[in-house]
From Swiss-Prot:
Name assigned to this protein: Ribosomal large subunit pseudouridine synthase D
Highest taxon in the source lineage: Bacteria
InterPro entries reported for this sequence: PsdUridine_synth_cat_dom_sf (IPR020103), PsdUridine_synth_RluA-like_CS (IPR006224), PsdUridine_synth_RluC/D (IPR006225), PsdUridine_synth_RsuA/RluA (IPR006145), RluA_PseudoU_synthase (IPR050188), S4_RNA-bd (IPR002942), S4_RNA-bd_sf (IPR036986)
UniProtKB keywords: Cytoplasm, Isomerase, RNA-binding, rRNA processing
UniProt-recorded Gene Ontology molecular function terms: 23S rRNA pseudouridine(1911/1915/1917) synthase activity; pseudouridine synthase activity; RNA binding
One Gene Ontology cellular component: cytoplasm
Reactions it catalyzes: uridine(1911/1915/1917) in 23S rRNA = pseudouridine(1911/1915/1917) in 23S rRNA
Subcellular location: Cytoplasm
Top class in the EC scheme: isomerase
């Protein structure tokens, strides 16, 4: 693995903060959990003194140095996987991710990912941590993602995400009849026993999801959602928590719940929709280098449009029977 050296100076306004919190602010391209691991592994120096206590308080003005081996993106293969590029300049790429595409290689997905595609599309991105990936979408969630082509761009985008300056909106179809919008403000953490899943947990990290009603159908509701935070599976977990799991999300309880007397054509559409009904429809951010406010929209994918058409047709066919 390649070795890198990170250095910075603790700012006066950070006086009294925990060391791990300070490092997360100074090096936002790395997660706080990774920085904490480096501290505990004796890889962090404060004024040339090794410290291994994440909760140690900083005073301001200290010199920080971290010498560490990091994951080598060159070990991943560049693959000629088509990317739907919505926007690109010297600093960022915005893509519209299709379904069935994993963002980053991992267990069970060593290749065939967005990262592999980025390495092929723009080879210099190998020098950027995680090949410039700033945030992720689940394998079967479609829509907009921003990727940084340089380390300065990535650092700024990660910092803006942490400060909730980047707006991400989604469209979804939730199970059940919802009559009003609202906010789910529930912290999240890894599931206690199913470690690949997430769950609402009082000791978890803050997670906030806003939602509003777009359209009601029989047994289902079309939603527009906005993230304040970006926890793994956040929308899926939050909607399941309020008893309205996303249609098609078998992981978090969104198995098909066909309405009474539904047509065979409608049932066929439900059976064929084998993913969570979730699409990242809008992305708004300040360009990390120029500061210009930029905004993109991604049209709903074909399978999502087909689903909405079927839900609407079923609703119209049975609207005389409805009591709401």
């Amino acid at each position: 693995m390649p070795q890198i050296t990170l250095s910075a100076e603790v700012q006066p306004e950070q006086m009294g903060q925990r060391l791990d919190q300070t490092l997360a602010e100074l090096f936002p391209e790395y997660s706080r959990s990774r920085l904490k691991t480096w501290i505990e592994a004796d890889l962090v120096k404060l004024n040339d003194r090794i410290t291994n206590i994440p909760r140690e308080k900083v005073l301001g003005g200290e010199r920080i140095e971290i010498i560490v081996e990091v994951e080598d993106e060159t070990r991943f293969e560049a693959e000629n996987i088509p990317l739907n590029i919505v926007y690109e300049d010297d600093d960022i790429i915005v893509i519209n991710k299709p379904k069935d595409l994993v963002v980053h290689p991992g267990a069970g997905n060593p290749n065939g990912t967005v990262l592999n595609a980025l390495l092929y599309h723009y080879p210099p991105i190998v020098e950027v941590p995680r090949a410039g990936i700033v945030h992720r979408l689940d394998k079967d969630t479609t829509g907009l993602m921003v990727v940084a082509k340089t380390i300065p761009a990535q650092t700024k985008l990660v910092r803006d995400l942490q400060k909730r300056k980047i707006t991400r909106e989604y469209e979804a179809v939730a199970s059940g009849i919802m009559t009003k919008g609202g906010t789910v403000d529930q912290p999240m953490a890894r599931h206690a026993t199913k470690r690949t899943l997430m769950a609402v947990h009082p000791m978890g990290k803050p997670a906030v999801t806003h939602y509003r009603i777009m359209e009601n159908y029989r047994n289902y509701t079309r939603l527009r959602l906005r993230l304040e935070t970006g926890r793994t599976h956040q929308i899926r977990v939050h909607m399941a928590h309020i008893a309205h799991p996303l249609l098609g999300d078998q992981t978090y309880g969104g198995r098909p719940r066909p309405p009474k007397n539904a047509s065979e054509d409608f049932m066929e559409v439900l059976r064929n929709f084998k993913r969570q009904a979730l699409h990242a429809v809008m992305l708004r951010l300040a360009h990390p280098i120029t500061g210009e406010m930029m905004e993109w929209y991604a049209p709903l994918p074909d399978d999502f449009v087909e689903l909405l058409n079927a839900l609407k047709a079923d609703y119209l066919e049975h609207q005389d029977e409805l009591d709401y």
